[in-house]
Every structure is written in C-alpha cells, then in structure tokens.
Amino acid sequence: MANIKSAKKRIKVIKTKTLRNKIIKSSLKTTIKKFLAAVESGNVEEAKVSFTATVKALDMAASKGVIHKNKASRNKSKLALKLNKLTA
C-alpha cells in the first residue's frame, strides 16, 4: 500500500479509469455481438442500423484510448465486409 499522498491518489484514479474502460469494452463487445447476430439472421435493415451503432462505439472507444485506433479501424473494415456480403 502506498504511503505518499500522490501515490494514493494515483491508485484511486487508476481504479476509476479501469472501471470506465471495462464498461466501454463490455458495451463495445455487446454492440458487436448484436451486429453479428443481425448479419447471421439475414436482417439487412437491422444490420445497417446496428453497423452504424457499432462504428460509433468503436470510434468512441478509440478516442477514449480504450482500444488502439488501428484496432478500431481493422474491426470496422471487417464488419463492413460482412455487411457488404449481406447486402450484395
């Protein structure tokens, strides 16, 4: 356990940021799963709406530093390919 005041504060800050990151990652995974479920079911309209929400969530997670911007871009590209296969 830290004795220095600033170190104690850092521990508190790290806990809150870790919690925030877990919440964002969890909601991101849920959004991606909803999109994939819509693609699997073949529902084009639901997939398009879900894709928009997923892209927004990926961009938000990347801007907050929860995931790397390249990972977000890679995921968006992969999901866009799935959507294009469904609509084609």
From Swiss-Prot:
GO terms for biological process: translation. One of its GO terms (cellular component) is cytosol. GO terms for molecular function: small ribosomal subunit rRNA binding; structural constituent of ribosome. Belongs to the bacterial ribosomal protein bS20 family. Binds directly to 16S ribosomal RNA. This is Small ribosomal subunit protein bS20. Keywords: Ribonucleoprotein, Ribosomal protein, RNA-binding, rRNA-binding. The keyword Ribosomal protein applies. It comes from the Bacteria.
